[in-house]
Amino acid sequence: MWNGANGVPYGCDHRLMTDEQRTRPVLVGDERDTLTSVLQWQRDTLMMKCAGLTDEQLRRKAVAPSGLSLLGLVRHLAEVERGWFRNVLNGEDVRGYFPQNEAGEWTEFHVEDADPAESFKVWEETCARSRAIVDAAESLDVTGHYGDEAYSLHYILAHMIEEYARHNGHADLLREAIDGVTGE
């Protein structure tokens, strides 16, 4: 269910990701396979948007006053994966990878001195852990908690697809501003 398309293993170099290597969504299948394949398609899309860029280009921010960058999106989505799959669904107490600074701001979008290779490694390892948690879940009805609220795996997968799709829209614009590359 989580295998990469065309034999490309997960954890492959994000700089080499192409459209042909993205995991294709399941078009006819059960709900779990459909949701997990669409989520993986969105993850692969983020990798594709970052492919072929230099460290400087990955750190390049959108127009002021936004601090948004492709590298910031990768780091943010690592945090989102951690939060929903490990902390909420799996009940772990895993602290942020990119903790708050002295001003109390989350630092995933502060990429001036961030190491892209390390950031991608964190994201890829977090995605692998998320896939393992999903694979181990008995059903989409399994729940986790955040505060007093319960969340099903079904909801979390749908939310993660929405989260990636929204940020991949940002990634489209960022990538086009960097080098003119556009595409799905």
Task: Name each region found by the language model.
Residues 30-35, 115-117:
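Active-site rim elements
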Residues 2, 9-24, 32-104, 145-184:
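Short, contiguous alpha-helical
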Residues 105-144, 154-160:
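Acidic/histidine-rich alpha-helical segments that form the ligand environment
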